[in-house]
């Protein structure tokens, strides 16, 4: 069984409040899905929720940064240890929800660490404000964090040969 395969499945009939799988439709709901193949398509038979991070949707900035984290994690997981990327993503999203740290500072930290882990940049002394463990990330001035994040996202797009949809 191949390990680097993406399978796409559609959830139908889950918008109804009484649907058994309506929780799987919520943004930032991480679920384990059991798929059933019907002809050339897959259907979701059951789902069990691993983690609900719906709190990311509490503000527009958190939602955008959370979406950026998801998209960059998905793109970088193809070339690195995907389990480590997933654990880092969950940690970052929880920090985004429960800490008072600026969302752009957390997004910058996450994207920067993905680039370092992928071997695309070397850490330097000038990066000391965001080259820290996610739990140690402190607030950076919002304008600075935003402009640095934008620069690192541009670099991310070049290094991973993708065009991000969320930022």
Region spans (language model):
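Non-catalytic alpha-helical scaffolds and adjoining flexible linkers that form interface surfaces
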Residues: 1-167
């Amino acid at each position: 069984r191949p390990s680097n395969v993406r399978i796409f499945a559609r959830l139908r009939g889950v918008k109804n409040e009484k649907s058994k799988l309506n929780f799987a439709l919520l943004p930032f709901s991480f679920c384990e899905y059991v798929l059933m193949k019907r002809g050339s398509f897959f259907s979701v038979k059951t789902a069990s929720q691993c983690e609900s991070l719906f709190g990311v949707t509490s503000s527009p900035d958190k939602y955008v940064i959370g979406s950026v984290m998801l998209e960059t994690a998905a793109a970088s997981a193809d070339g690195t240890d995907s389990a480590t990327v997933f654990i880092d993503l969950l940690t970052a999203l929880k920090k985004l929800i429960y800490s008072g740290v600026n969302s752009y500072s957390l997004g910058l930290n996450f994207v920067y660490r993905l680039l370092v882990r992928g071997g695309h940049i070397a850490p330097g002394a000038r990066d000391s404000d965001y080259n820290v463990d996610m739990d140690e990330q402190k607030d950076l001035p919002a304008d600075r964090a935003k402009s640095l994040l934008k620069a690192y996202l541009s670099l991310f797009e070049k290094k991973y040969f993708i065009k991000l949809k969320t930022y």
